[in-house]
């Protein structure tokens, strides 16, 4: 059974709610850019299998633009993390790193952040698998991923 909320708890929850909503918006944008990077990586693998170097160069450029947008999202996240209370910062850092803790303390915004961070990590892992396979196929023993 939940204890009745004190006025201070309600005010903190509202303030955290606004912060968490903004962080969720950034994570949603990051997820969208990571999904596009994944799509472009898959497209690039297909272009490489057809030996279509012109298309590969164009796709690499588009992927680079999306990577820059992900960096911008990460920068915004870093700015938010540096301005939140230590307890919230620690929780957010763990969630973003994939070390998911309980989100019930942070309500529906917390659950959304956990879901977005998990989905982003899944897309990133899928993209890395495709990228690793392409890189090893092209570079062989000189692959960036050798011994990783």
Task: Show which residues each predicted segment covers.
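Short terminal interaction segments
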Residues: 2-9, 92-148
